[in-house]
Amino acid sequence: MLHLHKSGISHAELTAGVENMLEMVGIPASRKSEYPHQFSGGMKQRLVIAIALACEPKLLLADEPTTALDVTIQAQVLDMMNELKEKLDTAMILITHDLGVVAQTCDKVAIMYAGEIIESGTAEDIFNSSFRHPYTDGLFGSIPDLTKNIRRLSPIDGLMPDPTDLPAGCRFHDRCPKCMERCRTVPPPAVKIGGHLIRCHLAEQNAEGGNV
């Protein structure tokens, strides 16, 4: 990566750069010549992050950076990413299905369904709002709540639509427990609710009625 983006770099500079990035992600520089099979899953994830940050990018795209990691290692990796983001003054777009990761890491949130942003705002607005998109509500409903005695979670019914044959109207309507007739034919507009935007006819209706 350094060879590719920094032409003319000397061997000594390359070695120093590799050692610096390893130390930055918590891996001893002495392990720079080891092979992938000699590292744990968490360390491999740290190495990938080190490679991504080696050339000091202004924007880091992190697609499911904690997949297949246990909870303890996941927390360590997220803390490290937050620290490096501040230290290197790098913006980060995190792609994840895990709302716990979102709560720990993100300032702003955009929730997508079938290739479309259906809700966006600050993390605080999304997590604390009294009104959310039905799909967002479904995501929150599928998270275990340790304060309640619930034997089964509440998964979202149905399946994702075929991206080559998206439904008319709201793309979520055939899975939505609050679906209205116009949801089946009319694409919903983005409506501002508090500090965030929701693409939902129900949000539009409630906003017009002054209920939210």
Report each predicted region and the residues it spans.
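Conserved ABC ATPase "signature" region
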Residues: 1, 5, 12-30, 137-141
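A short, proline-enriched helix->beta-strand linker immediately N-terminal to the Walker B motif
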Residues: 54-58
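Short catalytic/signature loops enriched in Gly
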Residues: 120-212
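P-loop NTP-binding/switch modules centered on Walker-like glycine-rich loops
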Residues: 2, 61, 65, 69-151
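Interfacial catalytic loop of ABC nucleotide-binding domains
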Residues: 33-35, 151
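Conserved ABC ATPase signature
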Residues: 35-39, 43
